[in-house]
């Protein structure tokens, strides 16, 4: 899309430039890199109960606090790191979510060694993006059979804050599902 200023977008991103840039350049674009998928999944887990724009505004803080979302590093963290993060105003300071990110990093390492994290996650869509054709926001589901299956599998592996609504939002963010509205100039 050349002229983003005059484009038609999905209405959920509103007029906020940060939200529009996220919509235009990230949301719905397939991500296969395991570390980037880990970052997206952890950020989505922190979003539980909050708005996504809150997480976007703190994303740089999260990246700094979580050492670029390096799973090998995060997996070794204990109470000192949790205490440090609970004092960091650049992130969402929620003990359960921080501890969940540490357990998620440990689970990531197990999955990556066994199956590969990216193939594991993409297996819930058959390895290819699911292309939906919503005409309005009301046509976009909050969860699907695939997000329920992914949620259950991630929980069994040790992830937290990954219910089926969070995993569906993750699938949208990672381009596993294309839910750009039919009228959105950024659909393709």
Q: What annotation goes with each model-predicted range?
A:
Residues 1-188:
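HhH-family (HhH-GPD) DNA N-glycosylase catalytic core used in base-excision repair
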